[in-house]
Amino acid sequence: MLPDLSIEHDLQRRGYANLAGIDEAGRGCWAGPVVAAAVVLSPAVYRQPDLLAGVNDSKQLTAGARERIYTSIQTHALGVGVGIVPAFLIDAYGILPATRLAMIQALLALPCAVDALIIDAVQLPGISLPQTALVRGDERSLSIAAASIIAKVTRDRLMATADHCFPHYGFALHKGYGTAVHRRALAQYGPSPLHRRTFQPVIEALLSLEQS
């Protein structure tokens, strides 16, 4: 089933007009930032949801489809905000606090007022706005699904750029996720400055290099 506006309509009936869907990309990666996006859909999308036809959980879409829909979201959203937390802060704070920080950054980057939040799976402490945390929210809420695509495309572009700076790791291919290619590169070259040194595969690569 594709995400829809059922949850958004329910919140609007309760008096919350501008709703921000929030999601992240890159939480489980071995390298690179965690990126979050916040998306407020426009009244036009609520009247005509097929303006964002094809929006789904970003993991279910091809890279080409994500790029196309990314453009549609930017065109039809009332506001889009992005937050980026780099690997060294992930190591300093831990991945969950870093994810929340990226989400708060994305919320603060929105160019429009927000009445309530619909978030994929987590709550944001210290934020006074009403929050609805949905497990697998990117499969249920169109706002969250749109945010997941913005976050994923933004992060993929960053990792493609990082591939030019650190060409030995294959970042353009795997985007920092754990793959056999990535593991072999870690074993051969050791971690780059973009690697999360508190993540177990990176720790193992460091220990192996120290012992060799």
UniProtKB/Swiss-Prot annotation:
It is found in: Cytoplasm. Its cofactor is Mn(2+); Mg(2+). It holds the Pfam family RNase_HII. GO terms for cellular component: cytoplasm; ribonuclease H2 complex. One of its GO terms (biological process) is DNA replication, removal of RNA primer. It catalyses: Endonucleolytic cleavage to 5'-phosphomonoester. Its main location: cytoplasm. Keywords: Cytoplasm, Endonuclease, Hydrolase, Manganese, Metal-binding, Nuclease. The keyword Manganese applies. Manganese or magnesium. Binds 1 divalent metal ion per monomer in the absence of substrate. May bind a second metal ion after substrate binding. Its EC number is 3.1.26.4. GO terms for molecular function: manganese ion binding; RNA binding; RNA-DNA hybrid ribonuclease activity. Signal peptide: none annotated. Gene3D superfamilies: Ribonuclease H-like superfamily/Ribonuclease H. NCBIfam families: PRK00015.1-3 (NF000595). Belongs to the RNase HII family. PANTHER family: RIBONUCLEASE H2 SUBUNIT A (PTHR10954), RIBONUCLEASE HII (PTHR10954:SF18). Endonuclease that specifically degrades the RNA of RNA-DNA hybrids. This is Ribonuclease HII. It comes from Chloroflexus aurantiacus (strain ATCC 29366 / DSM 635 / J-10-fl).
